């Protein structure tokens, strides 16, 4: 049976400042930690990315032509405050006013994120969100943006608090490149959630007319053997690290006893302690019912089995299937069942996981209000032929996930929109330029845009709301 989506459903495309804009040192933009980190550790940089800084009118015209009526954009903090605080960079402010005006001209609603992995270098080198001063700087930055950009109707505080902590302190593929420090992971998550809560409370106290929420990456975690209590426990602990800790902070305003028991177990095995203060929980409690929406970024699920041994994580950054490894001492090991397909980067393709995660939020956090799927898509080594890409695999991937959303809505979940990652091809943090996600192919040499087969398909779905 052909499935449909509601008439008011947003069919969006997602971007991020550092992955799309280029112009990393242009017009007074301050440095971010990624600038030097990429030069020192990778075979690519964020120049020119998709040159969105100059070519956003082209991308927004394409969005309008192809039925994309929402766009995720992030503001580069260091374009507004080059050192994270203090002096405002007027040219950066002007750029975003112009960008948002173009969005509205093209009838593409901007959903604007304040922080998408790109803390200014001056703050990052001073501990990033492990340093509590950063909470104050972030709230000041948020306050400035809320006041300066009244044309923005949808605000997101952070993109993917979970993967930031994981990337910086667990996997070690984000600057500062620290591995296996679970205490820093949880402390980073916590301090960023406090920052989120304080920004949300400020937004509501000021009476701004728009909406505000947060974007969490929520990869669903399953036990490899549902009958094995040790595997079930491994999945529960892995879920606490990546999902439950931050969801509790968002919607409970505290960490449940079950969550803290898991956190304490993980830290007892791996070392370290947390600094959780009374005023933190006052802030979390004050914001827990103020989130207008939850953004869910969903790409994959994981299966966990019990594991006794040392932590080892190997990141597959070059698309060599089967080269990744993930096992955490005292938690478990990721082992995918043979029947589940995966990408060349070992990302597990499992649309049912999205349904299960949405229903988990609905059940466990009934004060969630509404959900947008703020990222979902397929990274591919696209073959560019005949000025296009015949990306049937991407179409199939997106189709399956949209059908899941139709099911979730039918079963009572309030899902209001979907943003494909990504609108056009962008640079990928730890994979460079080979891993493409866009509806529009970008020739990174010429910066020309070419609609892929998926763009034509997405346009039809957006126009008809029929998933075909």
Curated annotation (Swiss-Prot):
InterPro entries xref list: 6P-beta-galactosidase, Glyco_hydro_1, Glyco_hydro_1_AS, Glyco_hydro_1_N_CS, Glycoside_hydrolase_SF
GO MF terms held by the record: 6-phospho-beta-galactosidase activity; beta-glucosidase activity
Gene3D superfamilies: Glycosidases
Stored PANTHER family: GLYCOSYL HYDROLASE (PTHR10353), LP05116P (PTHR10353:SF36)
Active site (catalytic residues): 160, 375
Reaction(s) catalysed (UniProt annotation): a 6-phospho-beta-D-galactoside + H2O = D-galactose 6-phosphate + an alcohol
GO CC list: cytosol
Keywords: Glycosidase, Hydrolase
Binding positions (D-galactose 6-phosphate): 19, 116, 159-160, 297, 428-429, 435, 437
Tagged with keyword Hydrolase: yes
The name this protein goes by in its record: 6-phospho-beta-galactosidase 2
Pfam family membership, one: Glyco_hydro_1
Organism, as annotated: Streptococcus pneumoniae (strain ATCC BAA-255 / R6)
Domain of life per record: Bacteria
GO terms for biological process, alphabetical: carbohydrate catabolic process; lactose catabolic process via tagatose-6-phosphate
